[in-house]
């Protein structure tokens, strides 16, 4: 059975994708509660943007798919590059340099943790037979 997922996307965020990826890498695979705690104490501007997207993904999971928010974890999260605004910086002797102000598209996908399968119970007869077989091989 495939796990249900919910996603949220923030487009045209005015932060370089390279800087956002540093924050995204911290929360990938973590539970939602852990991810929020990590983002709260990450002293980077983009942490607030990522937290906003994560909060939206959790709200989507709860509202659209009726998932239990306590069981959610960050299944995947990634950052794509958006368009760049080009600005000019004047240089010496009439020249100009182009400054690219980059944008990011942040995507966060949350899913419910898969239920742990019931632990397979060992057959007591098989375990006893194996113990007897091992006991016969040891001679002092």
Swiss-Prot record:
Disulfide bonds: none annotated. NCBIfam families: rplV_bact. Belongs to the universal ribosomal protein uL22 family. It comes from Heliobacterium modesticaldum (strain ATCC 51547 / Ice1). Part of the 50S ribosomal subunit. PROSITE patterns: RIBOSOMAL_L22. Residues 115-140 are annotated as: Disordered. InterPro entries: Ribosomal_uL22 (IPR001063), Ribosomal_uL22_bac/chlpt-type (IPR005727), Ribosomal_uL22_bac/org-type (IPR047867), Ribosomal_uL22_CS (IPR018260), Ribosomal_uL22_sf (IPR036394). This is Large ribosomal subunit protein uL22. PANTHER family: CHLOROPLAST 50S RIBOSOMAL PROTEIN L22-RELATED, LARGE RIBOSOMAL SUBUNIT PROTEIN UL22M. GO terms for cellular component: cytosolic large ribosomal subunit.
């Amino acid at each position: 059975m495939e796990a249900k997922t919910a996603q949220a996307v923030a487009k045209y965020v005015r932060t370089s994708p390279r800087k956002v990826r540093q924050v995204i890498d911290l929360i990938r695979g973590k539970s939602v509660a852990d991810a929020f705690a990590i983002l709260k104490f990450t002293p980077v501007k983009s942490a607030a943007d990522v937290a906003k997207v994560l909060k939206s993904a959790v709200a989507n999971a709860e509202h659209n798919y009726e998932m239990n928010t306590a069981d959610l974890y960050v299944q995947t999260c990634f950052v794509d590059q958006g368009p760049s605004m080009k600005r000019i910086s004047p240089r010496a002797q009439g020249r100009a340099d182009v400054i690219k102000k980059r944008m990011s598209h942040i995507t966060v996908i949350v899913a419910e943790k898969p239920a742990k399968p019931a632990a397979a119970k060992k057959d007591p007869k098989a375990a006893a037979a194996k113990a007897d077989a091992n006991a016969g091989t040891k001679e002092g």
